[in-house]
Amino acid sequence: MISTRGRYALRVLVDLAEHGGGSYLPMKEVANRQEISLKYLERIVPLLTRARLLEGQSGKGGGYRLTREP
């Protein structure tokens, strides 16, 4: 059985693969599309970043994107 955190992490990765197109997307957009609390995603995204599945950029036009092509 996959944990809730694991399911949500997978949903984030799939969402970025479908909507990212190589550009950085704010987690707020992903949270809204996936109907997941932004606060909960803020706990999951650092794990995906440490695993080198995502990379982040801060500032205007920032957000997260996949480190590899889907």
What do the PLM-derived regions correspond to, one by one?
Residues M1-V12:
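Short alpha-helical segments that sit at the start of domains
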Residues L10-G21:
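Short amphipathic alpha-helical interface segments
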Residues L25-E35:
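A short alpha-helical element within helix-turn-helix/winged-helix DNA-binding domains
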Residues N32, T49-R50:
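Alpha-helical residues within the helix-turn-helix
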Residues K39:
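Key DNA-contact positions within bacterial/archaeal DNA-binding proteins
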Residues A51-T67:
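Beta-hairpin "wing" of winged helix-turn-helix
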